[in-house]
Amino acid sequence: MFHALSSEVMGDGKERISGYDPLNYPENNRERRLLVLNKLLELGDISQEERDEAVADNVYERIAQNHTAAETGEIYSYFEDALIYQVVGDLVNIRGCTEEEAWNLLFRGGLTVYSTQDSELQRICETEVNREDWYTSDAQVSVVLMDPYTGQVKAIVGGRGEKGGSLTLNRAVSSVRQPGSTIKVVGEYAAALERGAVTLGTVFDDAPYSYQNGDPIRNANGSYGGRTTVRKAIVNSINVVALKSFHEVGLDTVFAQLQEFGFSNLTEEDRVEALALGGTHNGVTNLELTTAYSAIANEGTYLPPSYYTKVVDREGRILLSKTPVDHQAVRSVTAALLTEAMESVMAEGTGVNAAFSGMALAGKSGTTSEMKDVWFVGYSPYYCCGVWGGYDDFSAQSSGSYVKSIWRAVMQQAHQGLAYRSFEGTESLMPAVICTKCGELAVEGLCDATVQDNMTQTEYFVAGTEPAESCSCHVAYTYCEESGQIAGNYCVLSGKVSQVYLVQGTEGTADAEAVAPEDDTVCQMHQSWWNVLFPEGEGTQEWEDTPPPAHEDEEQPAERPGRDDRYWWNDWFRF
């Protein structure tokens, strides 16, 4: 609960007499205040009810509390800053106050604000942001921790180090930064999965590729993996596949999808291909990004962030009630697919260093050029958390691993004592074992035994979108171990070895070396049964047309009809 500074202390409007100071001389001020209130009633400027209400208000106790806070140097937290701005904004937009009236009402109107903050989670976030062990530089950081099912913000930290004052720069809410690869999930992948343009098993060729203006696009690791599923592209943050997915649905569709996820800082200047990889004119805030990922955790339902549940006046009347209006950013099955993929990010991809055991987790990393901005945003069945790191002046960084360390530390502590939960919605998806090089149904003994290793994956699909055809991209060859050539019918005793290759692969990618050799010559060493029985050339001596002459006095054997002693088999088969 947040108690705002409340009620105005009456004065004469012109003079400031020390003897009437409400802090040091409250009794004198109370008498003066009664005189003024009675005069206002006499003149008809206030009603009897308003006069009595003002008299009953114990404003002096609140003044003493606020003065004590000022003397002790108490400064509002980043959460309280954000809360104040939201309440003032709602007083203007919902209650119709002017901005000046809203500020006066909040700080002098006796209001009580019921906040969504969890003080223990706020303490955890502040502690971890300021833990020096995570850093090798003096980069700045922001953290947002939300309940994705209500939209309620539980904790916010808008900067690292000692907070210099109240209502100062809050990097979690106000700073717009380039989102890097975190935008892919809520941009092109969400848009393409939502519209059925791709599945998690759809395969794109991760090969040299260019923007429409001819500029080449490169992956972070500087290499190309060849045929790659959408899932693997999300897990390993592959830029080429992201841009190809972007092109599947088009710029306008992706832009509209991002608007559905609440990114309000996007402008018409952001309608460019670079948006696919997080290249924006202004950028996004941590609050926007964390809220967007919260929508995925909430089965596709977007809830705007809130810092309070209600605001009441001194009489207990509700002035503001925060009941967020939700909308469906994506279907629940689309959210389930994205969650499925981002669970793999945590298990085997770029989120491994942010993961911890004992809870279902999904998340995505993001890094811009020269690591000017580094991100990790992810969620559990309980909370969604976003961590940003970088310099206020956009300087380059040498490392960005600290955002994952902070995310893990915050989320691990936030989940202490909470029962394990799995993500809801994924149970409606249909599993199928696919070949990851073509996206079709895997063939046992073929796709799981290739020269590139096991190329099968249990993938999940919206019912009706799973593949129906079997793998068409792999071919098996059996080789003679002796000759190294394709085994023929007569290589039965020499030993054979099978190799499974790709039918084709793009040059310059990892697939190029996995394509079947062009030499399809059948074994030249074993061309007949003769070669089977005499693999080293035994029994292959040519006999002359006539047998050698016998000695003159040697008795000649009687000639048998049908027998020809010139051939070796006559020694085996007697007629």
Model-predicted regions and their roles:
Residues 4, 67-71, 197-254, 314-344:
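Conserved catalytic neighborhood of penicillin-recognizing serine enzymes
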Residues 104, 119-147, 231-234, 247-248:
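Beta-lactamase-like hydrolase cores
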Residues 215-219, 250-291:
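Mid-domain, small-residue-enriched loop/turn segments at the edges of structured enzyme/sensor domains
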Residues 1-116, 259-260, 264-265, 274-278:
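Non-catalytic, structured segments within soluble enzyme domains
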Residues 9-27, 36-37, 41, 65-71, ...:
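Second-shell loop/turn segments in exported
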Residues 115-134, 145, 156, 163-175, ...:
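A penicillin-recognizing enzyme superfamily signal
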Residues 35, 40, 125, 151, ...:
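Active-site SXXK
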